[in-house]
């Protein structure tokens, strides 16, 4: 079963994920050095019991993925709301003020994630027009 990437990502490969897997075939391991929306990994057509390795330097993105995995319902509380420009700007400022701390927590504790930060980031990344959200 394939899954759809839950948010848009510049350079995302959702449109070519099927072709990537057709060319890869049934690999025993998968490494994604620039995770982004994980469109290729989520588009894997076959169940997989090998090693999947994903990485991304962006702490807010990494937090979002960890919180989606561990605290999905709580993330949804912060992410699923109407679009408001004021909210987007306020959430971006809130995230930027905490970005270094969030990244440090992720690096220090494999079990840590912040659902509020993930929800704000997902809301912003889905609503922002153009590039530059939390850059």
Predicted regions and their residues:
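S-adenosyl-L-methionine
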Residues: 1-35, 39-40, 46-47
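Class I S-adenosyl-L-methionine-dependent methyltransferase module
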Residues: 47-135
